[in-house]
From Swiss-Prot:
One of its GO terms (biological process) is translation. Part of the 50S ribosomal subunit. Forms a cluster with proteins L14 and L19. Belongs to the universal ribosomal protein uL3 family. One of its GO terms (molecular function) is rRNA binding. PROSITE patterns: RIBOSOMAL_L3. This is Large ribosomal subunit protein uL3.
Length: 207
């Protein structure tokens, strides 16, 4: 059975194992999620479980959102996402961090930090040209292709907006689960800035 929960990235820290090994971990705060809707093939054309996280201030809500949340006997949520494969979920039920356990392999999805408009060296990791005084090629994008084509080829790595993309890191291992604090500690780093939305779900390519 697949598992999933929504949370917020708190930051990074480090923990030590019993034999003294240091492990860098990301702290994810996941207060209880509420099941807002259970979709089925008969009514929606596909099966999924809609989950809400983080209460939204009433001044920012509208009547449709309030009515949708009222069906689950809860308040409108700031973040609403769908999971596939959450069997046995019922409308109004809560999903807590203790559905996961230490050692579980998960995929973590977040929105990467936006870096603004950047050149090809920072954005794509290209090498720079000679920095000598006579060189006319320092941090430029390089060749645009042959003359005969008379156009820039598709997929050419150029300058542009960097970051602020949906990124998924696969096969991360949960180091610890702290139910009393609604916290999950995941080995390694995950995409996104502090306080950004994080989606944690069972790994689809777990070995």
């Amino acid at each position: 059975m697949s598992k999933g929960i929504l949370g917020k990235k708190v930051g990074m820290t480090q923990i030590f194992t019993d034999n003294g090994e240091l492990i860098p971990v990301t702290v994810i705060e996941a207060t209880p999620n509420t099941v807002l809707q259970v979709k089925s093939v008969e009514t929606d054309g596909y099966e999924a479980t809609q989950v809400g996280f983080d209460t939204l201030r009433e001044v920012l809500t509208n009547k449709p959102a309030k009515g949708h949340a009222a069906k689950a006997n809860t308040t409108p949520k700031r973040f609403v996402r769908e999971f596939k494969g959450l069997e046995g979920a019922e409308v109004g039920a809560e999903i807590t961090v203790d559905t996961f356990a230490a050692g579980d392999v998960v995929d973590v999805t977040g929105t990467s930090k936006g870096k603004g408009f950047q050149g090809p060296i920072k954005r794509h990791g290209q090498s720079r040209g000679p920095m000598a005084h006579g060189s006319r090629y320092h941090r430029r994008p390089g060749s645009m292709g042959p003359v005969a084509a008379n156009k820039v080829p598709k997929g050419k790595k150029l300058a542009g907006r960097m970051g602020n993309k949906r990124v998924t890191v696969q096969n991360l291992v949960i180091a610890q689960v702290l139910p009393e604090k609604n916290v999950i500690l995941v080995k390694g780093n995950v995409p996104g800035a502090k306080k950004s939305l994080i989606v944690v779900k069972s790994a689809i390519k777990a070995k």
